Amino acid sequence: MLKIFNTQLNGIFSKIDAQLEEIEIASQLLMQAANGEGSIFIKTFDEIDYFNDFMTKSNESLPHSKTLDHLDELHTIDSTDRVLLVGSFFTAELNHWIQKLNDLDIDFVVIANKDKDHKSHENLMHYIDLSTPRAIVPTADFSKIITPHIMALNYIYYIMFAEMYEMTQDLNEV
């Protein structure tokens, strides 16, 4: 089972690696807020909520990051701020937040699995595919277990964190 898990995880990480350009662009967008006078507001959904404190309060949190909890908080965001929305899937709630951000002309990044039903991800300017749409490890009864959303997000997060750290270092050298 461990070999299958390892092989499947490597496949997910390879799919994420193929999005490196999108991840770099998303990191640059978020860094515009962190390096300027703005903040990075982070809204997580469903099981990804467990990762929110890490992104905003840990020793390796995104710079100038804050948790975003309610839609009415969007009115406090200005043009110097950016928003990061992270969910396992495109839910009605995530789509509602996307609509509100678009209505308010706020720059944002979305990390989630592709929206196979409605193709919402195709209309986004800054989108990173989580690449974990289903469980990956087969069992003896032919079902599958382990849907590694958090592992995939952690991998994407650390790529973004490293990119943003490098940008900070480059800016400090100038």
Please tell me what each predicted stretch does.
Residues 18-35:
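A short, well-structured juxtamembrane/interface segment
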Residues 38-39, 44-170:
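Glycine-rich phosphate-binding loops that contact phosphosugars or nucleotide phosphates
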Residues 23, 170-174:
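Flexible, glycine/charged-enriched surface loops at secondary-structure junctions
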Residues 1, 18, 22, 148, ...:
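Catalytic cores of large soluble enzymes that bind and process phosphate-bearing ligands
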Residues 1-17:
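Generic N-terminal amphipathic, Lys/Arg-enriched alpha-helix
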